């Protein structure tokens, strides 16, 4: 898979230009099995009081390139959300038990995590927080250059939106995504919801580097 190159991807989360959290992906390999662990945490403060806080831990398991399980737990303020997904070997579909969805999903769905550029090729994604299935439309906007932490990248700019834009705004997909095609990785994601948010790639640890 395209993720065989990485040991760790680090991203930072900004709101209105202020750093408020992190989003890390860790990659472990054992033969044909790859386990990708995701940890993210952010909090929004207003006048010294935390008004919104999210902390999440998730684990995706692949055999070769096939997702076989995904489990996550998320604390949003004091509300617990979860996903337990398994590939059903008989039906060849995903069985999902989630905080906002219980049922089946086809294997064309991608877990909505930013390490995986296949999210740009999928017709629908599974929420990594609640397990809900969201149909999406990805549109190529154009080729651009972006500056991240003083480094210039050549990127393809896409929008990723819900197929049905009439669903409530807090459930809707509406992202701008900047993608480094040469290295098959998403470098930046932005969206607006209670402010302007951005998730930016900061650092990549490769298996060959000495400090792993």
Locations of the language-model features?
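Short, flexible active-site-adjacent loop segments at beta-strand->alpha-helix junctions, enriched
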Residues: 91, 100, 208
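Single conserved hydrophobic/aromatic residue that forms the stacking wall/gate
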Residues: 203-212
């Amino acid at each position: 898979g395209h993720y065989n190159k990485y040991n760790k991807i680090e991203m930072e989360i900004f709101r209105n230009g202020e750093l408020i959290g992190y989003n890390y992906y860790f990659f472990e390999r054992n033969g044909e099995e790859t386990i990708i662990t995701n940890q993210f945490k952010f909090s929004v403060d207003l006048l010294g009081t935390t008004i919104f806080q999210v902390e999440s831990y998730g684990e995706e398991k692949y055999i070769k390139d096939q997702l076989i399980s995904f489990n996550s737990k998320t604390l949003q303020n004091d509300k617990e959300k979860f996903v337990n997904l398994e590939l059903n070997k008989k039906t060849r579909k995903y069985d999902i038990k989630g905080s906002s969805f219980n049922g089946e999903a086809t294997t064309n769905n991608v877990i909505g995590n930013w390490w995986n550029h296949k999210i740009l090729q999928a017709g629908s994604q599974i929420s990594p927080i609640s397990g809900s299935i969201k149909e999406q439309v990805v549109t190529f906007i154009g080729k651009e250059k972006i500056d991240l932490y003083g480094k210039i990248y050549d990127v393809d700019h896409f929008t990723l939106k819900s197929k049905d834009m009439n669903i409530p705004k807090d459930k809707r997909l509406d992202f701008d995504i900047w993608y480094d095609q040469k290295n098959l990785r998403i470098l930046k994601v932005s969206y607006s919801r209670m402010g302007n948010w951005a998730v930016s790639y900061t650092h990549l640890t490769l298996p060959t580097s000495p400090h792993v």
